[in-house]
Curated annotation (Swiss-Prot):
One of its GO terms (biological process) is regulation of cell shape. The keyword Ligase applies. It comes from Streptococcus pyogenes serotype M6 (strain ATCC BAA-946 / MGAS10394). This is UDP-N-acetylmuramoylalanine--D-glutamate ligase. ATP binds at residues 119-125. Pathway: Cell wall biogenesis; peptidoglycan biosynthesis. Coiled coil: none annotated. Its EC number is 6.3.2.9. The gene is murD.
């Protein structure tokens, strides 16, 4: 970590804790800043704030009092989940207090080069794939960012010989000014988080900030399957490397079932460790990064063939009596489940789906359900899911929760079948988040394996 004097003796307000705020507070204190942390969670329910106070850092909890900004703060570091129309943020902007993001703070002190990955879908899987391939090739890749390891914490241990492989959300990118990765990946761009950004155009603009400071000596990897990529590519100074599953491009591409990089065959799609058309895209982006980083083809192929997925994201859990289980609890919308289904033989597949009822009809999912062996349906959206199953002429059973659904699926399954949890719905009708929902699937698998 570079020790810089930019923040020494500067009064800095950390707005919002969580993991990133806690890490930023500790980093800035180490750099000699005079830090105040403000978090909305009450102090007696806030172990992170309590720990910071014990370290001598000033904390103010329970609300975000606008009058706090009457103090002469020289910077604000904003939690990425707090929008720019928050009263505290608006007041800071009105007072012309510079607002930093936690990832940019990490960038300022990083000795290690950065590979940044953003996009609407596939960020976590692609980030993990890239780190795995780089490490398999003898490099030292450190996961950081939106993947659960705050960049401002990881950067404190990183040295010049490391590479920070950083997952970046639109929330983290919207406020960056100096941030410059050496390689950036945009997996795809879909209309998501519009409640935060206001419009698809503003959402894309936030994602596009990943390349704002890049030059021709840096590399930007874009999904050539999307028309928007061609438009965006004309506006960057970075060297663009495209990837595509639909056509041959001057980068990474799929052709006749083989993944290539610039005419060099790397791996067959059927040899990838994770199924689904979206994972072919993730693998192509990974191949592009790996080749730019000097990783040998055989190491790339071996690593991608053994990659078992990320927890809750089309994760291959294991087998019981030659019945394979996949945990895709992260699929909280129709598109994600469609992509998951694309990687399987429907005639040998039992799908567990359903969850929070957001008023969606599932007509778009019907073509992907055709030929399914069975569905197990659960949650508030069950009636709508049943209508989709009926239209696809797929038989189904109902379950009260994921555990019961998994047990039912296992009773119905035969040797060679696959059981897939891919709900196409959010979890909040029964579970606090998709992780808890997926953990119940994993726990049930462990019980079934123990009884087998």
């Amino acid at each position: 970590m570079k020790v810089i004097s930019n923040f020494q003796n500067k009064k800095i307000l950390i707005l919002g804790l969580a993991k990133s705020g806690e890490a930023a507070a500790k980093l800035l204190t180490k750099l000699g800043a005079l830090v105040t942390v403000n978090d909305s969670k009450p102090f007696d329910q806030n172990p992170a704030a309590q720990a910071l106070l014990e370290e001598g850092i000033k904390v103010i909890c329970g609300s975000h009092p606008v009058e706090l900004l009457d103090e002469n703060f020289e910077y604000m570091v904003k939690n990425p989940g707090i929008p720019y129309d928050n009263p505290m943020v608006k007041r800071a902007l009105a007072k012309e207090i510079p607002i930093l993001t936690e990832v940019e703070l990490a960038y300022f002190v990083s000795e290690a080069p950065i590979i940044g990955i953003t996009g609407s879908n596939g960020k976590t899987t692609t980030t993990t794939m890239i780190a795995d391939v780089l490490n398999a090739g003898g490099q030292s890749a450190l996961l950081s960012g939106n993947i659960g390891y705050p960049a401002s914490k990881v950067v404190q241990k990183a040295i010049a010989g490391d590479t920070l492989v950083m997952e970046l959300s639109s929330f983290q990118l919207v406020g960056v000014n100096a941030f410059r990765p050496h390689i950036a990946v945009i997996t795809n761009l879909m209309p998501t988080h519009l409640d935060y950004h206001g419009s698809f155009e503003d959402y894309v603009a936030a994602k596009w900030m990943i390349q704002a400071q890049m030059t021709e000596s840096d590399y930007l990897i874009l999904n050539a399957n999307q028309e928007i990529s061609a438009t965006l590519a004309k506006t960057t100074k970075a060297t663009v490397i495209p990837f595509s599953t639909q056509k041959v491009v001057d980068g990474a591409y799929l052709n006749d079932g083989i993944l290539y990089f610039k005419e060099q065959a790397i791996i067959a799609a059927t040899d990838l460790g994770v199924p689904g058309s979206h994972n072919i895209e993730n693998a192509l982006a990974t191949i592009a990064v790996a080749k730019l980083s000097g990783i040998a083809d055989d190491i790339i192929a071996q690593c991608l063939s053994h990659f078992g997925g990320v927890k809750h994201r089309l994760q291959r859990v294991g087998q019981i009596k030659d019945i394979t289980f996949y945990n895709d609890s992260k699929s909280t919308n129709i598109l994600a489940t469609q992509k998951a289904l694309s990687g399987f033989d429907n005639s040998r597949l039992i799908l567990i789906a359903g969850g929070l009822d957001r008023g969606n009809e599932f007509d778009d999912l019907v073509p992907d359900l055709l030929g399914l062996k069975q569905m197990i349906i659960l949650g508030e959206s069950a009636e709508r899911m049943k209508r989709a199953a009926n239209k696809a002429e797929v038989s189904y059973l109902e379950a009260r929760n994921v555990a019961e659904a998994t047990e039912l699926a296992f009773k119905l399954a035969q040797t060679g079948d696959t059981i897939l949890l891919s709900p196409a719905n959010a979890s909040w009708d029964m579970y606090p988040n998709f992780e808890v929902r997926g953990d119940e699937f994993l726990a049930t698998f462990d019980c079934l394996r123990g009884d087998a």
